[in-house]
Amino acid sequence: MLENLETEKSNPKTQNLDEMDIHEILRIINQEDATIALSIAENLENIENVVANCISAIKNHGRIIYVGAGTSGRVAVVDAVETVPTFGIDSGIFLPLIAGGEKAFFQATEHVEDYEESGKKDLEKNNVRSEDYVIGITASGRTPYVKGALSLAKEIGCKTALICNVKNPELMEFSDIVVSLRTGPEVIAGSTRMKAGTAQKMVLNMISTVTMIKLGKTFKNYMVDVKIMNQKLEERAVRIISEVTGLDKKTCKEYLIKADMKPKLAILMILSGKDKEFCIEALKKNEVLHEALKTLKN
């Protein structure tokens, strides 16, 4: 029963919410939000296992497919689309599927989450393969759209995971790993766009970010595979190259141009002292910059 879920219960701290002044409401929301990180900390081992599966899937030419409805679908879209400019990967490696399609991102279409068939069809339309890793996201742990997608993914032979906000979710049977972020009753009962949605977004950030780090998309703590799509990103790339190599920005921009606007390649050229073609070949063999650099220095 929906009413028995932790996310649907009334929060005893906010039962007189409508009578509180603005400052008191803000203080309580802030206090409740402070508990989110604790719910994530309890799941770090499971999140680590999800990341390991993401890395394996991408290395085997699979995709990471996020599946969600409503807020869960929207946070999935936000996380997935940002991986392209941040880490310079192809669009679709992180693929978000939201119940109701693209229009549901901008306009609430809550009824569309009620159909298992829709989840299955959306996976089929995107040619899901056994190499893909399918991650369902649902606060209640029981959304039919997500169930349809996860059940089909299991049939096909995909590894699967579930990110939810309740204990013992219904969709456990379709999930190899369950990340149960027990954020408890919301400030407004049942409004899972609040703590539950925030927790989901934080975990997706962790999953995509750590996956990309371990696949060589950073050097130290710099996004060296950033895709230069505008002036701001070009300036950032030049600054990254300068901070990593110690060279002045003018020289770094010259190297960036020589490296076809690829910061990682420019850095390797500078730090190794090797020419462009040599460095391109080194990165083909090993995309992890610090490892490629060791190879060239040996």
Curated annotation (Swiss-Prot):
PROSITE patterns: GCKR (PS01272), SIS (PS51464). It is an enzyme of class 4 (lyase). The active site is at 82 (proton donor), 113. Residues 54-217 form the SIS domain. It comes from the Bacteria. Pathway: Amino-sugar metabolism; N-acetylmuramate degradation. The keyword Lyase applies. SUPFAM superfamilies: SIS domain. Its EC number is 4.2.1.126. Keywords: Carbohydrate metabolism, Lyase. One of its GO terms (molecular function) is ether hydrolase activity. Specifically catalyzes the cleavage of the D-lactyl ether substituent of MurNAc 6-phosphate, producing GlcNAc 6-phosphate and D-lactate. A lyase-type mechanism (elimination/hydration) is suggested for the cleavage of the lactyl ether bond of MurNAc 6-phosphate, with the formation of an alpha,beta-unsaturated aldehyde intermediate with (E)-stereochemistry, followed by the syn addition of water to give product. Homodimer. Belongs to the GCKR-like family. MurNAc-6-P etherase subfamily. This is N-acetylmuramic acid 6-phosphate etherase. The gene is murQ.
